[in-house]
């Protein structure tokens, strides 16, 4: 009798292990992504390449903005054709913004009157020159152009995405940008401020900011070897081989609700060549995290911040 009971117990225990393993596999297979910030340059001949790449890598949605000579309305049209996949973002970049021309406000207001945008693209605060494609931009966080965009984001309940390349700043300028970013965070404690590219900060530099400012979130764009190896910019590398490095993994585990997956693809090469390899890195990295953390970073935090329905 005892032997029979023991056998029954072992069978039940084995069944539980099999069930648990099956659930874990199901959880891993169901992990999907939301790219919380990308852009589409006019040199991408076929915009459907975006959807193709998303389908290949289980990216459910992309928050997308126009770039270069591509018009913002083209992104809205694309979103209407793919309403569950593309989230159209107000375009913020322009020569008018860079030169403090009043046309910047006119361009923004025209898009806002359209009423179909669901997000706003990043605001460039410090952007180092990138060859002949992207000029240097230096606009402090307390500039009227930035305050205008912030008020738009607050009014529409959109996260405010900022771009500061701290590793490309030196001395007094770096200190000023850091202090003014802290002021921005402190003055808007109830609004999500999202720093693209981790701000080009190291893990030990970002950690105290995440602890102090609960409204600070960071995008993971351009932080993997697939893109870093093709760039001469000092991007933050979150990886050690195919997995997250220990310092970045620990920081994500400490602040799982403040990290948001993003790619920030822009150019043809980003979409056509680099996309599959970038996604391979991120799938490998998130597979090494607890399921609830992986889901938060991959899509949950973006859904919460941008008020997007889960898949």
Where in this protein do the model-derived segments appear?
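Solvent-exposed, acidic/flexible segments
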Residues: 40-47, 68, 101, 139-146, ...
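Catalytic pocket-lining loop regions of alpha/beta-barrel enzymes
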Residues: 80, 84-86, 90, 136-260
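Mid-domain alpha/beta scaffold segments of enzyme catalytic cores
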Residues: 28-148, 152
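Mid-to-C-terminal alpha-helical segments outside catalytic/metal-binding sites
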Residues: 4-5, 25, 31-34, 45-68, ...
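Active-site environment of divalent metal-dependent phosphoester hydrolases
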Residues: 41-44, 69-72, 95, 126-129, ...
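Bacterial N-terminal signal peptides
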Residues: 9-24
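Extracytoplasmic/secreted proteins, especially bacterial periplasmic and envelope-associated proteins
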Residues: 49, 74, 103, 107, ...
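Short loop/turn segments at strand-loop or loop-helix junctions that form parts
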Residues: 121-128, 163, 220-223, 264
């Amino acid at each position: 009798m005892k032997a029979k009971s023991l056998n029954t117990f072992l069978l039940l225990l084995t069944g539980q292990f099999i069930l648990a393993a099956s659930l874990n596999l199901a959880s891993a297979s169901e992990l999907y992504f939301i790219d919380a910030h990308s852009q589409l340059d006019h040199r991408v001949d076929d915009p459907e390449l975006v959807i193709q790449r998303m389908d290949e890598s289980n990216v459910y949605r992309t928050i997308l903005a126009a770039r270069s000579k591509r018009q913002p309305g083209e992104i809205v049209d694309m979103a209407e054709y793919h309403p569950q996949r593309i989230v159209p973002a107000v375009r913020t970049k322009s020569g008018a913004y860079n030169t403090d021309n009043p046309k910047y406000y006119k361009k923004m207001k025209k898009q806002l009157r359209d009423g179909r945008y669901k997000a706003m693209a990043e605001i460039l605060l410090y952007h180092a020159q990138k060859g002949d494609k992207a000029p240097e931009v230096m606009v402090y966080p307390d500039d009227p152009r930035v305050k205008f965009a912030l008020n738009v984001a607050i009014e529409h309940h959109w996260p405010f995405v900022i771009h500061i390349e701290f590793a490309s700043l030196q001395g007094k300028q770096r200190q000023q940008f850091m202090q003014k970013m802290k002021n921005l965070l402190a003055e808007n404690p109830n609004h999500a401020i999202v720093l693209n590219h981790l701000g080009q900060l190291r893990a030990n530099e970002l950690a105290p900011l995440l602890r102090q400012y609960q409204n600070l979130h960071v995008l993971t764009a351009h932080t993997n070897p697939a893109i870093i190896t093709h760039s001469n910019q000092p991007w933050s590398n979150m990886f050690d081989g195919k997995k997250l490095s220990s310092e970045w993994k620990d920081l994500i585990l400490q602040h799982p609700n403040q990290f948001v997956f993003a790619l920030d693809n822009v150019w043809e090469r980003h979409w056509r060549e680099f996309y599959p390899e970038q996604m391979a890195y991120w799938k490998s990295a998130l597979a090494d995290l607890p399921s609830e953390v992986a889901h938060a970073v991959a899509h949950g935090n973006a859904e919460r911040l941008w008020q997007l329905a889960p898949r």
